Amino acid sequence: MSAAIDELQAIIAELKSELEEQKTTTRNARERIERMSAEVVDSNPYSRLMALQRMNIVKDYERIRDKAVAIVGVGGVGSVTADMLTRCGIGKLILFDYDKVELANMNRLFFTPDQAGLSKVEAAARTLSFINPDVCIETHNYNITTVDNFDQFLSTISASGIAVGQPVDLVLSCVDNFEARMAINAACNEKNMNWFESGVSENAVSGHIQFVRPGDTACFACAPPLVVAENIDERTLKREGVCAASLPTTMGITASLLVQNALKYLLNFGEVSDYLGYNALSDFFPKMTLRPNTQCDDRNCLVRQKEFHLRPKPVEKLVEVEVSDEPLHACNDWGIELVADNVPTTTTKSPENTNVAFGLRLAYEAPDKSEKSETTATAGDGVSEASLEELMAQMKSM
C-alpha cells in the first residue's frame, strides 16, 4: 500500500513539474534575437551591454555569443553567476549539480519556493531560458567526484564548446566542498584549461575568487587547505543540527567578482585578478598572485609547469609617443610660463630661513647677525667720542 502511495506521489510531482514547465514556456517569453543590436529602444535587451563598445571598454561585445562557460555547482554563488552570465548574453552555459532545491535555500538568491523539490540544474535552466532564450542551456544532474561521472565531466568540458568537439572557454567552480574542487582542479590540469575557483567562508562574512592558469599560477593542490592536506573526510566534520552560515549579500558580491573577471577574460578587457578576496567586516579586498608549487601532488600540474617554463615569453612592445611642440591650450589669460628643467634657478636662501621650499624666495631678507652687530658697534663708537657737555650743547641748539 505504501509503495503505491509513493508511486502516486512521484507521478503527481512529475505532473506538477511538467505543468510548471508548460507555464514557464507560455508566459510571454520573447522571441530569440539573431544579432545583438546597439539600438537604444525599450524592446532591445542588449542596448546597455552594447554601449560598452561605444564607450571603448570592449572592442566587440557580440563575441560573447561565441563563448561557452561551464558552471560547477548551482547553489548560492553558482545560481547567481549563471543568472548574470545569462543576462550578459553568453553563448552557452553548461550547468553541473546533483542537489535539489529546498526551502532552506530561499535565504540565498535566484530560486523561488515553488521550485522546491526540483533539481537545481532543472530549476535554473527553466528560469534562465525564460530570462534570455538566446542562451543555450545544457544541464548535467550528477556528482562529478565519482569515478564514472568524473570521466563524463572531463569529456563534457573538453568537447562541449560552441564549436563541435571544442572545449569550453572557461570553467567556473562554485562548489561548497573541497572534494569537488579537487576534482575540477584535476580535470582542468589534465586538459590544460583555465578555470576560476570561488568560495564563501562558513561564517558568511568573507569570500574569494582565484584564477588558475595551469603551470603559470598555483592550482588548488599547490597550497591545499588543511582538510585536503591531511586527507580528512569532510563528512566526518559535519554535526547533526549544525550548518554553515549564509548571507545572500556575501554570495552576491562573490558571484559579481567572479562574473566580472570572467567577462574580462572572455572579452579581453581590463585586468583579470589572479586572486581577489573580500572581507565584509572591514570591507577589505586583498589581491595577490599565487605561484605554482614545484612539489605539487598533482602530476599534471608539474607537467604544466614544465610546459610553461619552456613556452616563449611574450616581449613587450615599446610604444613611441609623439611629442608635439604646439601648446596644449592656445589661450593663456594668466600669462603662465614654463621654465625648462635645465635652466638654473636664482633662488637664494638666507641662513636664517633654511626651511623655505624649493622654488620660493623671500620678498625681504634680513641682514646677517654679523653685519647688524658691526653697524651697532660703529654707532656706539661715534657716541663715545663726544663728551656729555658737548652733547648737552648740541641739544640746546636744536
From Swiss-Prot:
Positions annotated as active site in the UniProt record: C243 (glycyl thioester intermediate)
Transmembrane segments: none
UniProt-recorded name of the protein: Ubiquitin-like modifier-activating enzyme 5
Species, as recorded: Drosophila grimshawi
Residues annotated to bind Zn(2+): C219, C222, C296, C301
Single Gene Ontology BP annotation: neuromuscular process
Keyword tRNA processing: no
PANTHER family listed in its UniProt record: UBIQUITIN-ACTIVATING ENZYME E1, UBIQUITIN-LIKE MODIFIER-ACTIVATING ENZYME 5
Keyword list, A-Z: ATP-binding, Metal-binding, Nucleotide-binding, Ubl conjugation pathway, Zinc
Top-level taxon of origin: Eukaryota
GO MF term set: ATP binding; metal ion binding; UFM1 activating enzyme activity
InterPro entries cross-referenced by the UniProt entry: D-isomer_DH_CS1, ThiF/MoeB/HesA, ThiF_NAD_FAD-bd, Ubiquitin-activating_enz
Binding residues for ATP: G76, D97, K120, N143, N177
Bridged cysteine pairs (disulfide): none
Role description: E1-like enzyme which activates UFM1.
